[in-house]
């Protein structure tokens, strides 16, 4: 099938003759065909930026590519030929054909065709109070190659050949629109709206709901690891975590006082079981009207500075604290946010209101309250929960999409356009503010992610999953795929978050010997995950809850 441009207008557009413009100084060329401007830019010898922009549209600045990247080709030449226009680097040949109006990417050294466009189309729509394009780009893949990445999903898919996936954020689903091939190239699809990917007999297709243009990066490498290295060069390198982040994280939903939390740490030390981090989950702020007040409840979490100093000085353990993007109506920060007009008026499952993190004023207010109420008390690491952001029914992709879109426009545009990047903005806010305070390395755990988020010192986990063997198995493919998108730090709730719920295989929890064996296997798997962490609800996760010295499960957890 030839590359075609489909337009659904009420007006008729005259097709322009194909013409080309080349600029070797800027390492790019542009061609104009069928009212589309196609721009091909050489960022380095293995990273090529492709934009296809309809007449009258203007693309927006990328949120994922670094604004001041140091990318530069060692060699780039642009030339016309009988077939069209070619761009040569030391590693690649990028060709535009005037016959089918498609771009192909070839390994210049071996002469092997790596990837070829097949078709693209644009459909005019009115979405989110603006006139936008639905966009579609189809690529031709070779029969033998496998493709990975795209994020973390719960279907148990490893290789996306012949598969369809919805790139939508949800409680247990994480989006990163970066695809990587066993033929040592990747495609970074630079769009933040609802996106679908499908590979079938017609080709490999990216489709997005809201766009001004088709915008993607072709990223090659000498091997798959080098492809990811080039992805990091484009979107940001991964900062080094503090050494403690690579130790064991003890967590559960939840410790109800500093006394309980400190007793758990003391018991780990008494039993001489290694522990580097203790985690305080939600409701340290008190009841629901005080949701995420960004300060400690004075009844059960009194004298926080002294309590945290004790964890540091006496037990040599670090504290991670859960913070959310929404606030209860009885909190000071809610009143400040409401007065500034930076809260979304969309109902949530716990009655809080979510802030518009895209608004600089919201980010300023959030940090000012967090710094005074929590950071200055000595908290070491930050668990940013529900950063999809969570409204209601957040475990279901379509419901999460619906609630987000109905929340109204964001500061920078419609939620339809910026559907998937809430967590990227949250992470940027936290990381940049933390780095301005001191020279300590940053650790942020967040439930959602997007391309480029790795540059903000974040790890991710797979959400509120259920205790079943098939769910456990699906975490392996989900974790491997998200890590192959260049986000290397990922983990799960050891033993699953929900153990006694209706969908669990182990409704008796700890009373079921089968669950204790199940937990052991998952705990062992987490020991070899990038982040070694236990967490969940209903069933406590301290090692001694599963047996005593001499018991097979207890001893297995320690070995």
Feature roles, as predicted:
Residues 3, 17-235, 239-244, 251-253, ...:
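N-terminal accessory segment at the very beginning of proteins
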Residues 4-14:
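Sec-dependent N-terminal signal peptides
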Residues 9-11, 143, 454:
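Enrichment for repetitive, rod-forming helical segments
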Residues 239-251, 345-354:
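N-terminal small/glycine-rich loop or linker at the start of catalytic domains
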């Amino acid at each position: 099938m030839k590359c075609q441009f489909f337009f659904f207008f009420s007006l008729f557009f005259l097709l322009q003759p194909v013409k080309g413009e080349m600029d070797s100084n800027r390492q790019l060329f542009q061609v104009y065909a069928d009212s589309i401007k196609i721009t091909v830019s050489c960022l380095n010898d293995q990273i090529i930026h492709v934009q296809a922009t309809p007449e009258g549209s203007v693309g927006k600045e990328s949120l994922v590519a670094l604004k001041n990247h140091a990318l530069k080709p060692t060699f780039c030449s642009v030339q016309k030929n009988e077939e069209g226009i070619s761009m040569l680097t030391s590693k690649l040949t990028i060709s535009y054909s005037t016959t089918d109006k498609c771009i192909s990417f070839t390994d210049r050294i071996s002469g092997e065709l790596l990837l070829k466009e097949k078709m693209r189309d644009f459909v005019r729509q009115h979405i989110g109070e603006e006139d936008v394009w639905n966009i579609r780009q189809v690529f031709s893949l070779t029969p033998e190659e496998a493709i990975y990445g795209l994020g973390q999903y719960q279907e148990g898919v490893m290789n996306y050949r012949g598969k369809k996936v919805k790139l939508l954020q949800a409680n247990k689903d994480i989006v990163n629109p970066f695809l990587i091939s066993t033929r040592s190239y990747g495609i970074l699809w630079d769009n933040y709206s609802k996106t679908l990917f499908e590979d079938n007999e017609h080709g490999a297709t990216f489709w997005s709901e809201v766009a001004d243009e088709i915008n993607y990066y072709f990223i090659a490498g000498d091997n798959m690891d080098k492809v990811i290295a080039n992805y990091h060069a484009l979107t940001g390198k991964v900062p080094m975590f503090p050494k403690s982040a690579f130790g064991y994280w003890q967590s559960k939903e939840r410790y109800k006082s500093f006394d309980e939390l400190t007793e758990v740490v003391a018991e780990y030390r008494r039993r001489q079981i290694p522990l580097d981090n203790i985690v305080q989950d939600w409701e340290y702020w008190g009841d629901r009207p005080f949701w995420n007040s960004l300060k400690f409840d004075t009844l059960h979490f009194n004298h926080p500075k002294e309590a945290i100093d004790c964890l540091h000085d006496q037990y040599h353990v670090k504290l991670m604290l859960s913070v959310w993007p929404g606030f209860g109506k009885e909190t000071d920060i809610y009143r400040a946010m409401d007065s500034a007009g930076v809260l979304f008026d969309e109902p949530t499952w716990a009655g809080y209101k979510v802030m518009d993190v895209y608004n600089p004023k919201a980010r300023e207010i959030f940090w000012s309250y967090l710094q005074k109420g929590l950071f200055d008390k000595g908290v070491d690491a930050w668990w940013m929960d529900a950063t999809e952001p969570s409204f209601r029914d957040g475990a279901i992709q379509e419901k999460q999409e619906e609630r987000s879109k109905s929340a109204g426009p964001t500061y920078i545009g419609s939620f339809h356009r910026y559907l998937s990047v809430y967590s990227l903005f949250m992470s940027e806010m936290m990381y940049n503010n933390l780095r301005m305070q001191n020279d300590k390395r940053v650790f942020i755990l967040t439930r959602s992610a997007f391309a480029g988020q790795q540059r903000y010192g974040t790890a991710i986990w797979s959400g509120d999953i259920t205790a079943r063997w098939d769910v456990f198995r699906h975490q392996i493919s989900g974790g491997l795929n998200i890590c192959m998108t260049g986000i290397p730090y990922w983990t799960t709730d050891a033993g699953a978050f929900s153990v006694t719920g209706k969908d669990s295989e182990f409704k008796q929890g700890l009373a079921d010997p089968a669950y204790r064996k199940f937990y052991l296997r998952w705990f062992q798997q987490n020991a070899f995950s990038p982040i070694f962490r236990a967490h969940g609800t209903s069933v406590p996760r301290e090692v001694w809850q599963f047996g005593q010295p001499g018991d097979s499960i207890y001893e297995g957890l320690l070995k």
